[in-house]
């Protein structure tokens, strides 16, 4: 439990400002922007790391890298904790269209050492780009991420008035059978504050999803340990809960992530991050100048 808790806290440490749009801004800077001029100075694998920038890989770097003036070993976390944050245990050469991978070229040897010590199954052949099976606890960290962020995004949308109270309540109620819904309605008659009602519903949904993901994990333990289990735990939950979860995901995409306020922030993020990268590159290239 402590390993998973620590990994949950650490796994997003490498995300840039503006979240996933920040990752895209960094990638685009190098693939389409002024960073293209640096391509000739980098190896193909280093270039892949930059043009498919990934926050999870950056988290692994931050946690393990010996930065200037610091002790060796980064944050000096246990191997199990470090392995538990690597959701995509392969190099950027295998990133694909989703640009997901687990470690930069600069930390590839570190992950190989961790995998060797923990006995993590290597899936790639010696002449292929590096790819491993996941550490079993990755599935629990990923499930916690999938559950918490999806449900909290719905609650946040309610607070920001992107979703009405009835819409939000309806999305959460989908997760329960008729008997449980009646009990929830009884609580809501006592707790009249609408934000408290939604917080109670969100917490109840989270509990149901945790219980169901736990079932999926324990029932597929052998496949997980052998590196044969495919996909996150959340896609294998029972049909009623899966349908309700997918409905929340669809609404979040349509009404939250694509809202004008969010898109305005993303556009601003592109400009901010591009400017910051320019300044940092210039500082490295011309250290004699004052900025």
Show the residue positions of the predicted features.
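Substrate-recognition/cap regions that form aromatic- and gly/pro-loop-enriched pockets
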Residues: 219-291
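Charged/polar positions within long, soluble alpha-helices
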Residues: 64, 149-152, 156, 215, ...
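Charged, amphipathic alpha-helical oligomerization/scaffolding segments
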Residues: 139, 143-146, 209-212, 216, ...
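Non-transmembrane, amphipathic alpha-helical segments
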Residues: 132-139, 194-205, 233-236, 257-268
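Long, amphipathic alpha-helical stalk/connector segments used for oligomerization, subunit docking
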Residues: 184-239, 245-246
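Residues that form generic nucleotide/phosphate-binding pockets
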Residues: 62, 84, 88, 113, ...
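Sequence-structural signature of the catalytic-core scaffold of metal-dependent phosphohydrolases
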Residues: 1-6, 13-201, 210
């Amino acid at each position: 439990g402590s390993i998973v808790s620590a990994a949950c806290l650490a796994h997003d440490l490498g995300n840039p400002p503006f979240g996933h749009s920040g990752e895209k801004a960094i990638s685009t800077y190098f693939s389409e922007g002024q960073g293209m001029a640096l391509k000739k100075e980098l190896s193909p694998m280093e270039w892949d790391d930059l043009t498919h920038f990934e926050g999870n890989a950056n988290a692994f770097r931050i946690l393990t890298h010996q930065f200037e003036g610091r002790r060796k070993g980064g944050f000096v976390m246990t191997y199990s904790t470090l392995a538990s944050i690597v959701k995509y245990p392969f190099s950027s050469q295998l990133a694909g269209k989703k640009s997901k991978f687990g470690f930069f070229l600069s930390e590839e040897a570190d992950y190989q050492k961790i995998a060797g010590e923990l006995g993590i199954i290597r899936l790639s052949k010696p002449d292929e780009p590096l790819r491993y099976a996941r550490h079993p606890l990755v599935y629990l960290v990923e499930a916690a991420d999938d559950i918490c962020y999806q449900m909290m995004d719905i609650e946040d949308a309610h607070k920001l008035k992107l979703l009405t109270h009835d819409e939000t309540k309806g999305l959460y109620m989908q997760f329960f059978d008729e008997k449980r819904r009646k009990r929830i309605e009884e609580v809501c008659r006592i707790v009249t504050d609408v934000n408290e009602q939604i917080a109670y519903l969100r917490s109840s949904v989270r509990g149901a999803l945790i219980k169901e993901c736990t079932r999926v994990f324990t029932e597929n333990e052998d496949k997980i340990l052998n590196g044969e289990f495919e996909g996150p735990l959340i896609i294998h939950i029972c049909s009623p809960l899966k349908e309700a979860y997918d409905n929340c995901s669809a609404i979040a995409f349509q009404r939250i992530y694509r809202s004008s306020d969010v898109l305005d922030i993303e556009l601003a993020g592109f400009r901010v991050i591009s400017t910051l990268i320019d300044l940092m590159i210039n500082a490295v290239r011309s250290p004699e100048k004052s900025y």
